[in-house]
Amino acid sequence: MATTTTTIKAEAPSRLTPEHAIYDLRTAATPRISPNGKRIAFVLGETSRETDKPSSHIWIIDPDGANARQLTRTGTSHSSPAWSPDGQTLAFVSQRDGAKPNAICLLPMDGGEARELVRHRAMPGSLAWSPDGSTLACTLPVDPENPREEERAKDAPPPVRVVRRIDYKQDNRGFLNDTRMQVMLVSAENGEIRQLTREAVDHTEPQWSPDGRTIAAKVSNRNGMHSQLALVDVATGAVEVVGPEDGVLATWAWSRDGSFILFDGEDRNIAYTDYFRYDLASGERRRLTDDLPFSSESGFPTISSPAQPVWLDDRIALVHGIEHGASGLWTIDSESGDVAEVVQWEATHAGLSTDLSANLIVQAWSSLEGTGELAVFDRAAGETRIITSFNEAFFAETPPAKWEAFSIQRGGEMIEAWLFMPHDFDPTGSYPVVLDVHGGPHGNYGYSFNLGAQVMADAGMLVVASNPRGSGTYGRHFANLVRGDWGGEDWLDLLAVLDEVLERPYADADRTGIYGYSYGGYMTSWAIGQTDRFKAAVCGAPVFDMESFYGTSDIGHDFGEEQWGGTPQERMAWMIERSPATYAHKAKTPTLIVHGEADERCPIGQGEQMFVALKKTGVDVEFVRYPGGSHLMLRGGPVSHRIDYYTRVSDWLRKYLAVDR
């Protein structure tokens, strides 16, 4: 699909170090285009060297990239911009000082200061205006034992925690018990708030029906591993749930007349989703597609929102997805289920916002050569433009890695991969090679900015990132090949991709390393027990012992059964066979283990077990623990921790792969 790219050359290029990237790259995100298509509101995030903390503000820009300006000044973090139906007011969430620092604010677009509507201790999410502009729906965490968010006395001991539900904790949120996200209705006139939903399950991403009488939201069960569509009566709060409890819901949208809902989901969690139509009058739920060619952008729990479908007319919807690692737009016929590609890019886009005419589509943009900008697709002209240049100067003075996309055939499947090279790559030289393994296992690499690979390439290494069987964006069949086969054919795919790179004269087969996080951490810990070909390994937040992971991870009891084919009692022999812990005594590779201490997804105990096993074996091993770090610490952890993480990863590999750059 792609060949080696060209890069901007600077006379004296700066090093693409973790510190430089994290402090100096800015990120434009969450774009929202006004109803008339004349203005785009978005969030611009950056990190201050003075405070060592991230901040974000609401900006506005014209669709052609002109007249960019900052709208917010008060507060340190702003998010969730949402236009009123008439386009005259912009709602957003602002973090400010005080015991209840999170405010929903309204900014009149014809001039004047933002008005605080209501404040909360927790961060409101998913702002959505009612069709008549009188009310904002949002989501807030509600603790049934402390619904008014009353502060505990400073000298009071922590309360005793009594647990009766299996999903009592969640990564990036910590201990929950019955605290769950609920839909709230806030008066845009006076800030009066009403709790609409009450069942102790998470309700997210509320969408109003065209007549304003019903809200469609996502109900998440078992920490988001399963989800359903919930139709909530605005007057009474009564809830109708659509779809099986063991199913999944990815994206959804009301039809223009409110008679049906188009949604992307599946009857059970099988790593891939398809489109359905739910007719409100008849209650019929009809499958429209079977085995989509792309993966929908369904968002990531606690981090990002889904890219919801938008209507082009009464029948055809436009949706965003990712196929073979590349973002694109497709149309879905809500009657026939016919799918047609509109455009595809060698880039990764996020979100999906359009004006009332559905001609201009604005999304956040990232590629292998840049990141943090906004892209506008003109549907009538068929043209895509990057309308911001926040990081242009950064990449002019700090050239990104060169790259090459390639693929191999193995076991009847095509395995795609990307090779990253130093920006000043010399084909007559000799370079160590690092195998970079993604998480998931249904994650994927593709056409997005990969900071880890960029840092390693800048440090003088070749980095090969691939999508072995089990990866997402290649269809249902490919994704499901990893189920019940962790460390099997996927491992052999990775080795085959590495061997392909090592055939090149500039790749040094005597200096190979492996790096991975989450499922990539599993594969790294698996690798060092299977072979001694790697001279260095970096293992981030691994699954090391399947049996203990099952009972201690926030999703192990559900995800584990789906992936491994049953409970430990049913699959113990297989779990022992496929656990890296079983083979750790064979390891010889110098290994760095990096792990967040508050990781509830792959708990710190997995890293602890691995460290002890390797230490007892006599391996040169180091264990780095990040206090307070969740499984998502690389996306939103303390700035100093993220810089430390990427620096240690690079330094460990440079040391043991003899990189003298």
Regions picked out by a protein language model, each given a short descriptive name:
Residues 468-661:
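Active-site-proximal cap/loop segments of hydrolase catalytic domains
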Residues 390-510, 517, 549-558:
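Cap/lid segment of the alpha/beta-hydrolase catalytic domain
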Residues 53-57, 100-104, 146-148, 180-182, ...:
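Structural motif
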Residues 2-9, 55-56, 141-186, 288-291, ...:
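Predominantly five- to eight-bladed beta-propeller fold
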Residues 20-56:
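Beta-strand-rich domains and repeat architectures in extracellular enzymes and scaffolds
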Residues 25-40, 75-93, 114, 119-136, ...:
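Conserved beta-propeller blade repeats
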Residues 62-66, 108-112, 187-191, 233-237, ...:
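Short loop/turn segments that connect beta-strands within beta-propeller blades
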Residues 17-22, 69-72, 115-118, 192-197, ...:
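A short beta-strand motif characteristic of beta-propeller blades
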